[in-house]
Design a protein with these regions (language model features):
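Acidic/histidine-rich
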Residues: 250-294
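Generic C-terminus detector
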Residues: 283-322
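Nucleotidyltransferase catalytic core that binds NTPs
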Residues: 2-258, 264-266, 270, 299-300, ...
């Protein structure tokens, strides 16, 4: 009797899951000893788990850029330093096995899923990274210390994983800017790659916290992306910074159930608010609460100078005539 061929094991395609620093070092060393091509690189995607298609887009991009024999590491760590009093640290969704299966299909080689005592062996760190003034406005104003906590763990994970490339979503625009500044200001030898926001078909930006929304709240939350799209259209038509903000604010204010923390049009390299006469690239940012869920979103816009009023040249010429 012929024994049927055993189908390929899904387990064989799973990434190596490591929980300790020693296990991570072994995984890094094993890849180095495997003789990767000189064009292959090590890439890292840092997450807090509860992965969705937005995270998987980061992993797929990391797989593509690392090269066929490169090493893609996904970190899954709910960082307590990023949560303030009364925030959802205890209830933040966690599903390690489900997350591992998802990143396996996206091309991850290693999952580093440490516990807080592994990342912070001495408890809360005495020395932390400061986001400076970037961490004092917008998200920093509403979540004091959040960006400092994010930068501290990012720097630690960069040291632990030693990547050539690190991938971050553009949905967390202020955090991405802070990471870029930290890497540049502190001479960290890594290339930071921003990946565009992934949205559901209805426009809602993917977020692990979307799971908290009821069906009605989810429909209400669509006002965020709708306001950003409308603001971008006004910017492209020459409406000016004030009109961009007024249009976006009007949509948010008209939607019952949306409580806005901030709506701002900022310089994408500094997060400073742009002046009323600004033209050129800008970033339209919003943070709002729908029910008990806090959501953020943003849209890159190009503020076009308003068109010159018709007839101005003729009028000027007539006034100059004797």
């Amino acid at each position: 009797m012929t024994t049927p061929a055993t189908p390929p094991s899904e387990e064989a395609a799973r990434p190596t899951v490591v929980r300790t620093r020693a296990e991570l070092r072994d995984a890094l060393a094993a890849w180095a000893l495997s003789g990767p091509d000189v064009t292959d690189r090590r890439a890292v995607v840092m997450t807090m788990g509860a992965l969705h298609d937005g995270h998987l887009a980061l992993v797929r991009k990391a797989r593509e850029d690392a090269g066929p024999s490169g090493q893609v590491i996904v970190t899954i760590f709910v960082n307590p330093l990023q949560f303030g009093p009364g925030e959802d640290l205890a209830t933040y969704p966690r599903d390690l096995e489900g997350d591992v299966a998802k990143v396996a299909a996206a091309g991850a080689d290693v999952v580093f899923a440490p516990t807080p005592d592994i990342v912070y062996p001495d408890g809360d760190p005495v020395v932390r990274v400061s986001a400076g003034r970037i961490g004092e406005v917008l998200e920093g104003a509403f979540r004091p210390g959040h960006l400092d906590g994010a930068l501290t763990v990012v720097l630690k994970l960069l040291h632990l994983t030693r990547p050539d490339l690190a991938f971050f979503g553009q949905k967390d625009a202020q955090q991405l800017l802070a990471v870029r500044r930290m890497v540049r200001d502190l001479d960290v030898d890594v290339e930071i790659v921003g990946v565009p926001t992934v949205r559901d078909a209805d426009g809602l930006a993917l977020s692990s916290r979307n799971a908290y929304l009821s069906d009605d709240e989810r429909r209400t939350a669509l006002a965020l992306s709708r306001s950003l799209r409308s603001g971008a259209e006004v910017a492209a038509s020459g409406g000016g910074a004030r009109d961009v903000l007024a249009t976006a604010a009007g949509i948010l204010n008209d939607e019952d159930g949306v409580v806005v923390d901030y709506l701002a049009l900022v310089d994408p390299t500094t997060v400073d608010e742009v002046p009323a006469d600004h033209t050129g690239p800008a970033l339209l940012l919003v943070a709002a609460r729908v029910g008990t869920t806090r959501l953020i979103d943003n849209e890159a816009v190009d503020v076009v100078a308003p068109p010159e009023p018709e007839g101005d040249d003729d009028a000027a010429g007539q006034e100059a005539s004797p």
